[in-house]
Each structure stands twice: as structure tokens, then as C-alpha cells.
Amino acid sequence: MNNPSTPKAPLADYLAHLPLAEEERARLGESASFSELHARLAGEGAASEAGGDPALASVRARLQLGSPELDDAEMFGVDAQGRTFLKISPPIRRTKVIPEPWRTNILVRGWRRLTGRSNPPKPKRALPRARWQRVGSLRRFILLLLMLAQTSVATYYMKGILPYQGWAFVDLEELTRQSLLDTVQQVLPYVIQFGILALFAILFCWVSAGFWTALMGFWELLTGRDRYRISGSSAGSEPIAADARTAIVMPICNEDVPRVFAGLRATVESMAATGEMERFDFFVLSDTNDPDIAVAEQQAWLELCRETRGFGKIFYRRRRRRVKRKSGNIDDFCRRWGGDYRYMVVMDADSVMSGDCLAKLVRLMEANPEAGIIQTAPKASGMDTLYARMQQFATRVYGPLFTAGLHFWQLGESHYWGHNAIIRMQPFIDHCALAPLPGKGSFAGAILSHDFVEAALMRRAGWGVWIAYDLDGSYEELPPNLLDELKRDRRWCHGNLMNFRLFLVKGMHPVHRAVFLTGVMSYLSAPLWFFFLVLSTALLAVHQLMEPQYFLEPRQLFPIWPQWHPEKAIALFSTTLTLLFLPKLLSVMLIWAKGAKGFGGVIRVTLSMLLEMFFSVLLAPVRMLFHTRFVLAAFLGWSVQWNSPQRDDDATPWSEAIRRHGMQTLLGLAWTLLVAWLNPRFLWWLSPIVGSLMLSIPVSVISSRVKLGLRARDEKLFLIPEEYDTPRELRATDEYTYENRWHALKDGFLKAAVDPLLNALACAMGTARHNRAQAIETVRGERIGKAIEKGPEQLDGATRLALLSDPVALSRLHAQVWEENRDDWLGRWRKAEADDPHAASVPLAQVVPGDAGLLPAAQS
């Protein structure tokens, strides 16, 4: 480990951080200056080829010292200016990716058609109508009838439950002849009831859709007789054609680098074990704008390639211009390298996929030439907080029913969730590029939730979108706590509301119009439920505080009495609970039938279900208020900030819980007092809502605790098969994550500017390779001068990123820091090394060719 109490001369200190033989270190130590040192490292002529920048000239030599395997893998290249670079990505072979402008206004579209300026969608593929399309249309028609029938009966019952039944006796002409106050008193109860009835019908129809989806999923999984199952079209052992090349792409942005590259390594090794590695390439597509994380990604890429011998198969690209977020990241990949591949598998930063699953997806694509997207059903795993474990259990137990049910109703016109799916590259390039939504405001601009839109465009072009719901080997992780989940929901809510602008776009398949609608209802149902509860409370207030109007028309002989039918209310309440909770019971019954050992046994899985149901009841009102806020914020253009502090073990601090849930607690308390004052008996009906709101702070904090999650696992509660018998890929991910965190790189930009090896790596991976021009030299000089003046603590992020992307500027900064012995840079770097218990001992030992050469932060 470094000892800052024994200062060294800068030249000797520099050489101590290069893995050299003692004789070579002594020879280089005779250099009179750093310029001479870099010239000796680079060899004769190299400095002149690098344009007179000695530190830039020695980049290759320094990299060879730290990572001699780069030479064996032929990873070095020289650009047009004679500067060394690493072949971190394949040669670019550009493909046109042209998004079609959206025409969301049907009036404008009609006018353009009348004036002969219509721009129709691109023509569909000339494919015969398959049998599954007719079957799917019939099934969805039946689903619609079931939902409407069920909703009609429930709404009829609800109408009979409401107390005011005399709306038909209200005479509009009579209302115009009386005072406004009398009119309000007479009509207000019926207006409120009408609002309650309308909201109830919408919400019940939404619940009904989920019920029938789960019910048919239960039938599919119980019988196993799904003749349209996409995974049944391949035996799973067919040879993959040599030209069926597949790119596995992982878009990332400011992610947890140790976890991301651990999961990717597990996936790469699993793929290699199948023997099909030659047909797959891996791409890490970074949109990271944090310089420290960007340097950590570069080092992690090198270590990953070294450990897996993946040079030339695992590629890395960081965008300097972050356009259109994730969809733009994918577009950029398709534009540069999409023409080299027949298929593309998209993974999230937390995704892990087995090699068998990846190979199976390619075989399914080969066996189904009409398929454009095949989506797997990722299994959630890998988290330890109590909240995450409950969510993992819920998605693992209940999720298969809903996924199989979606497949039953949608068949080849299904969902795409944006990750853990395979895509046919050419139609994706031709039809799925996303133009920004026209106009101004919060619902214009770059599309946020791209996945549903891409699936709709793929289907509009005539290609199928399938869910391989029974395909194993696809995994993901869930947010560790409620607040992190809500932060994700904030983005999804806005994105789904934006997508609804595409509901009437020409050529969209009716199923995908329905998908846009269900995406909106996933979040719009929250304010609808909230307003339903508010109107119910308002009706209670009207009933208690206003004198009933018994005679609603002149010369009426008999009064209209408010009515109350508790037996109907109980029946309707029971029916609603059945629709909500029967799918969960059916899921557990399916596990009973097929074997509950992986879930902890029959008793444990049943107890886990009951506990999860209890927590879901507690959390539903909390989510309702947050989602209501998100919807209102999106419509009103409000900015909702979520600047969560760094947490230990992903736990929610009490201070943050109070800040996020404090208003909900006060609302629950005020609501309780109001209803208790109006009619205490009504609290029995409202207690699950207001009680959950008042308990939101402790529930949010306690459920985020890792200790409680681990204790539940020890008791076999919320156990999932991936924990009982952990797949090889998940075991490897955990192991590699632990290893990566052990030597995780900190202060990445500082070390890229100062450390001899990391500076060489960053320079070789820099992508801003400009020709020589006076204007460029002026900008470089300004950036370097700013870095020297401000120091590592005060330098802004934009300048750091610009320096990191420019190998010339970064090498000059590196040289100037050492030549001038800049204490603000060198002192900060030495302190960071001293504070790192896993930093390498200096002087670094020589790396023998063929050994696993390591960068400094990776040694222990």
C-alpha cells in the first residue's frame, strides 16, 4: 500500500506506478525530464508520430506494460494522425436509420389527404393472414364481451347501492325557476352519485381485464396445451446458421459499474459454454455523463475482456452526444453497426441471461421468419431488502399467470418491455426509429417509454411481436425499496401518458392501440381511484349535512327516501375482492399442484402469499397518491425532483421517509377525523385507505431493511426457486459483483488524469480524434488551463468529460501535472491511493506476458 509520509521525487514516483523490471526502472530513472522519460518509453520516432506530445506517444508502451495481452489480441490501432487507439468497437459500416415524422392530429391528417399531401405509413409486408391472427381477434372479442358484461352487472349493483334513487324525478324546467342554492341542494347528491358511478365502471372494467388475463394464464399453465406457444416452434438443438449473427447490446447510463459488468461477465461466460459464441458479439453502449463512472466503465471493460478472453467480441462505446436517451442510444448502434447483424438482443443494466436462453431466442427467430420481436419473461432475483423480496416473490408467483394470460389474448400482437428480448434487426431499422413527438409542452419531444411504441411500429409493418413466457434463463433485478420504485414509476408514468398521443396514428394495430390505453390506465387508474374515494366522502358529507329533498317535483304524492342496501354492498365488495385476490390464490394453487419446494413448501408459500397480500393492501393507497401526483405533474408540466441521498444497504432513512410520506400521513389523519365526525361507521369501509396512509412512513422504512429481508429468507418466507436452487449465471453474478466491489475504482477522472496506466487506457479509448487545426488547439489549451487552474476538486463535469474524450488534451494534462509537480492533482491522487485499502503496493511488479495483467485499482 502507498505511504504518503515518505515523499518521492516525481520521476521516481511515476516509475513506481509502472509495472517494470528493476533494471528497466533504473534505466528509465536516468531520464532528465518527463519528456525524455516518455520518449524512452515510446521508442525512437514514436513522439514525432504523435505530433510532439511525449505522453501521448507513450500510451501504447504504458498499456503494454500493464496489459500485455492487448498485443496478443491485436487490439492496438493507429489513427490518421499517428495516435494510438484501442479497437474497442468494430469498424463502422453505416446504415440509414430514418424516423418517420408523427402525424398525431387526425384533422391535420385529413386535410393533408384532401390536398393530396398525405404521407401514409410504409407498406406492410405481403404476408398471408395466419391462423393465429384470426384466433387472436376472436379471443379479444370474447375478452371485451366478458369485461363489458361483468362491468355492466357490477355497475347495475352499484347503482342500486347508492342512496339517492330519484334522479328521474328531477324536472330541469323546475330547476330554472328556483334559487341557485335550492338547485344545488337538490341536484348535488345526484351529480356526485353520477360521478361515483362513472368512475366505478371505469375502475371495475380495469380490474376485470386483469382478472380475465390471470384466469386464462392459469388455464394455460395448468393444462400446458398452448398450440400457439412460440417457444414450441423450435426443438432447441438446431444448428445456428453461420450468417445468423446476433448483437447483444446493453445500454447503460451512470449505472453501478461493478454490478453491471458482473452480470455481463456471467452472461458472456454462459454464452461461451454453449459453444455458439462465434455467432454473438456483446456491446456496452454507454450514455454515462459522470466522468468518474465513465473511467470506471473503461477499466471494467478491459478487465472483463481480460478475464473472459473477450477481446474482439466484447465492445464498448460511450456517446458524447446523448440524443433521445435510451432509444437514441440503440438508434446510434443500429446506424453504426446494425447492418452487420441479423438479430439484436437488448439487455438492461441489471439483466442477466443464460447462454442457452440466448441461443434459444436465435433459434426461435430462425424458425419463425415472420417474428419481429420475441420477448422473454424475466424472473426477478438478486435483492435482499424486505420490500424487494416481497416484490420478487409477487412477480415470481403471480407474474407467470399474467404473462401467460397476455400471450393467450394477444398472441403475435403482444408487448415488448424494452429488455431481455430479441429483435430482428432489419425491420427494426426500417420501421422502428422514433421521431420526437411534435409540439411543445411536457407531452412533446423525445419519446420516454420507447418499448411499447417500437412494438406497435413493428406490428404495423407486418411483423409479429411474441412473448416467450415459458423460456427460462432470463433474469432482472427490482428496485430495493418503495421510494426507488416510485422514482422509476415517475418516468414510466410520463412516458405512458406521452405514448397515448399515438393512439390515433394511422396504421396502428387495434391491439397496440389498446396497449397504449392500458399503459395510460396503469397510472391514470390512481387519480381515478382517488377521485372515487373523494366523491364517496363528499356524498357522505352531503348525506349527513344537507337536508334530503324528499319531493323533487310539484304535486308529488309520495316522498323519495334515501335508500341503503347493505346486502348489495357486501355482495359487490366481496365480488371486487374476488377479482383482485383470486389470481393470487390461483397462482399459489398452481404452485401446490406443480411442487412448492422451491418456494419453501406448501405452508411457507401460502403464508408468504398472505403476508404479501397484507403488504400490498398497505402500499396500494400510498402508490395511489404518488401516481396521482405524477399524473397531475405530467399534465400541468410540473417538475418532480427525486434527489435521493446515498443509502447504506439501499435502506430508506427516516428523514427521507418523513419528507416523502409526511403529507400522506397528514392527509390520512385529516381524512380519518373528517369521516369520524361525519359518520364513524363509515370508517370501517375507509380504514384500509386512511390506515395505510397514516402508516406509510414506518412501512416505507421498515420494508427497506436488508436485515428483515435476510431474516425472512432464513425463515423461508418470500422464497423463490432462484434462491432455493440458484442458477449458475446468478451465482456467478453475485460472485463477480463481490469481487468487483472489492477493488471498485473511485475518483476515476482524477486517476485517468494522473495515474500512468489509467491515463494510457483513457487516452487509447478517447473518441474525439480531431485533425490538427488551430481552433481545436485553442480550445484544448483553454480546457487544460482551466483544469490546472481549478484543480480536481473544482473542475466542472462538462470540462472533465471533454478532456476524457480527447486523447490529446488528456495526455497533455497528464504531462503538465507531472512535469510541474502539481500538488493539487498529485497530492489528491496520492491521498486517494492511500485511502484505498485495496490499492496496489508500489513499486508495481512487472507483468509477465500471458499472466492476467491488472490495472492498479484491481490489484490487492
UniProtKB/Swiss-Prot annotation:
The keyword Repressor does not apply. It comes from the Bacteria. Keywords: Cell inner membrane, Cell membrane, Glycosyltransferase, Membrane, Transferase, Transmembrane, Transmembrane helix. It is found in: Cell inner membrane. Pathway: Glycan metabolism; osmoregulated periplasmic glucan (OPG) biosynthesis. GO terms for molecular function: hexosyltransferase activity. It is a multi-pass membrane protein. Its EC number is 2.4.1.-. The chain crosses the membrane at residues 141-161, 187-207, 515-535, 572-592, 599-619, 682-702. Pfam families: Glycos_transf_2 (PF00535). InterPro entries: Glucans_biosynth_gluTrFase_H (IPR023725), Glyco_trans_2-like (IPR001173), Glycosyltr_2/OpgH_subfam (IPR050321), Nucleotide-diphossugar_trans (IPR029044). One of its GO terms (cellular component) is plasma membrane. GO terms for biological process: glucan biosynthetic process. NCBIfam families: PRK05454.1-1, PRK05454.2-1, PRK05454.2-5. Belongs to the glycosyltransferase 2 family. OpgH subfamily. Involved in the biosynthesis of osmoregulated periplasmic glucans (OPGs). This is Glucans biosynthesis glucosyltransferase H. It comes from Pseudomonas paraeruginosa (strain DSM 24068 / PA7) (Pseudomonas aeruginosa (strain PA7)).
